[in-house]
Structures are given as structure tokens and as C-alpha cells.
Amino acid sequence: MVNIRENAARILPAALMAGAALFMISPVVIVLTGSLTDGIGPYIDFFVWQPAQLRAMCNSILIALCVSVGTVLVSVPAAYVFAKVRFRGRGFLFYLYIIVMMMPFSVTLLPQYILSREIGIYDTPLSMILPGIFAPFAAFLLTQMMKSIPDEILEAVRLETDSPWGLLWYVLIPTVRPGIVCAAALVFAEYWNAVAEPLVLMESAEQLPMAVVLDTVGGADAAAYTAVILFCAVPLFLFSYFETEIMEGLGAYRLK
């Protein structure tokens, strides 16, 4: 009787976790099998016979990739300045970043629309890319990670190199790599799935990303529709691949 209870105590949690895992992965399996109902025909149609859909997918890749890479290039030096460079007004500027980050999305969308009209980038990918690059979330996240690096280590490195870029490249970037990957992945997923921004900042069908034109794809053809949905689920695979870095990066997402 004791052995039965011990076995049940071990098997039941494992069975529950396996059931939960199957339940969570079932949407991906359903979409994958649905897209292969007609073989690989829907995928061939997508890349060969549907230029509008392919263009929308390329727009999504262009916007999400440019914003994620640009965000890292801008946020890493900004985080270094906030975390390790002392100057008058640093605290005020940093908390201004936090205030902007906490603003409702709709509050910043209208200024983006007006500014894109004024500088001539309305109805182009730049209307989404430029504001996205300077979004404060990534800088805030990386600042928290860089604050945890002891100043003594940085002083020792400064004895070897006088260049702040050398310090950034050889010490800070390797140390905060999980935060960089986390920020890039989250920003990529955000702009890959963006719907409101392109609806406000773009009007030409040729400029719209896949998340917006998804409703026009497939029609009665369920296989084609599920094939496109699978392409739109790219961030899921991205998160799975970088799971460790993302979790470590989110662990540093706290005020110090």
C-alpha cells in the first residue's frame, strides 16, 4: 500500500505536467497539421503565387528586425550612461524614461502620427522603425543589469584600456548578454505582432505587415490560412530558442 501511494505521488504530478504541456502545445500542432492538409501547396502558393502576402511578410521581417537591432544599438550605450556615468540630472532623465515607458500606448501613438506626417515618413516602414528604436523599455532593462556590475571591476578594466567603447565591448556587453537577448526578443515579438501602429501610420496596402493583412488571407481556404498563421507564430519559436537568456534578462527587470 505504501509503495502504491509513493508511486502515485510520483506519477500524478508528472502526468499532470505532461497533460498541461500537451494542452499548451496543441494549438501549434493543430495549426501545423491544418496547414499540411493539402500538402506543401499552401506554402508554395504563399511564396510563389501570392506576391501581396509575401510582401506583407517581408514588411513584417523588415520592421521587426530593424527595430530589434536598432533598439540594442541605441539602448546599450544609453544604459551604460545611466548606470555608470555620473552627471547632473541623470536621475531625473532616467525616471523620465520610466514615465514614458508607463504611458498608455494610445497616448504616444497620436504624436507618432503627427511627427511622421511632419518629417515625411508617413506610410513608410520608417514611421514604425524610428520610434521603436528609441523606446525606453530596453534601456531601462539593461540599466538595471549594468547597475549590478561592481565599479571596482570597471576601474580595473580602465587600467588596461582608456576607451569607453573597449570597456563596453569587453566587459559590459558580455555581462548583460541575457538582457540584450531578452530585450531584442521582446521588441521583435512586439513589432512582429503590431496591428495598431501600421493601421494608424500606414495607408498603402503595399506597406502593411502580415499581422494586419492576416484577415484577408485564405478566405475559405483553411489550409492557406493556417499556413500563414504558422508564419506569424515565428516569435514563439524565437522565445523557445532563447528561453534561458530571456528568463535571466527578465530576472533583472526590477528597480534598484
Q: Which stretches of residues belong to each language-model region?
A:
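A structural signal for multi-pass alpha-helical bundles of membrane permease subunits
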Residues: N3-K256
